[in-house]
Amino acid sequence: MDYDSPDPMNGASSNALIAKMNSAKLLYQHYLDKVTPHAKQRWAVLGGLLCLFMVRITMAEGWYVICYGLGLFLLNQFLAFLTPKFDMSLQQDEENNELEAGEKSEEFRPFIRRLPEFKFWYNSIRATVISLVLSLFSIFDIPVFWPILLMYFVLLFFLTMRRQIQHMMKYRYIPLDIGKKKYSHPSN
């Protein structure tokens, strides 16, 4: 028996499996590309999934640790969404050096996010679906006193958001499009 040569039947089934997986990946990417321009609908679906998850947690009266973990993950993603990609304090140090040298420029610098909107939505959808799936198995229902988790989360939320708002005020940037002037193409 020759062990060096691959089994032709095994190779054919392996190639068929790889072809099916590649086809599924392409189909998945195709649908992701189709939903990309529809931001309002994407976020509405995420809101619906989060409501479904909260109803599931409330009705089942369990899986509070999974809910807490999802909340922390979404908070982390939201902070990355609000945070600029480049550290403002380093840029301010460079500007101070320019001021001393007399080279201050009022050049416009756009706000570039650390986490783009689509990736924020995509990561949030994946985390919510995973949390919904985990809430189907009783092994993940760890007994815990949920008011403590809620208090921890609320405290963490307020402390991190206060720090983020102070950072936004200190370096004078607005990460959201609310109140910003929108330019449109003139219609003929």
UniProtKB/Swiss-Prot annotation:
It is found in: Golgi apparatus membrane. The chain crosses the membrane at residues 43-59, 62-82, 139-161. One of its GO terms (biological process) is retrograde vesicle-mediated transport, Golgi to endoplasmic reticulum. Keywords: Golgi apparatus, Membrane, Transmembrane, Transmembrane helix. The keyword Transmembrane applies. GO terms for cellular component: endoplasmic reticulum; Golgi membrane. Its main location: Golgi. Coiled coil: none annotated. It is a multi-pass membrane protein. Pfam families: Rer1. Involved in the retrieval of endoplasmic reticulum membrane proteins from the early Golgi compartment. Required for correct localization of SEC12, SEC71 and SEC63 in the endoplasmic reticulum. Belongs to the RER1 family. This is Protein RER1. It comes from Saccharomyces pastorianus (Lager yeast). The lineage of its organism: Eukaryota, Fungi, Dikarya, Ascomycota, Saccharomycotina.
